[in-house]
């Protein structure tokens, strides 16, 4: 070790790309191709449409309902906006940092409008390409939304009372 330290954002991969460039490319893809500037990430790939005939759009490949407008992907999208805002602020680009913070706030509002089910007091799984609101009581999605800061205190309390069984949701096949 020679004592030289390289900033991670200046690190170059085997393709010759700096980390900063790779992050910008990934964010640009989410903002443009996946329509993130609308406040909701939308997967327009016909294979990932959130229907029973579609393919899952994420790690949870057994759940074909993830796709098109997925709560799971949108949680990560929200977190990526906050992370980009932090990076931009750290490197002194306050204009970009504020842009990402404003978009994160827009995304938080859109997330709650689209994925929060008032009648059940929890977040749904997704909205498929046919406009169907799919809810399979995904506890991990609800926990992740709370952890990410998307849920209000009241929403988090509803979620945890459902999960611990003190609040029962009619029609659920599993309780507490």
Can you name each region flagged by the protein language model?
Residues 29, 83-86, 158, 162:
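Alpha-helical scaffold segments in soluble metabolic enzymes
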Residues 2-72, 95, 99-129, 163-176:
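Active-site acid/base region of carbohydrate-active enzymes
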Residues 35, 89, 116, 157-158:
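Short linear functional motifs in flexible/disordered or boundary regions
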Residues 1-14, 76-94, 141-155:
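Well-ordered alpha-helical scaffold segments within catalytic/enzyme domains
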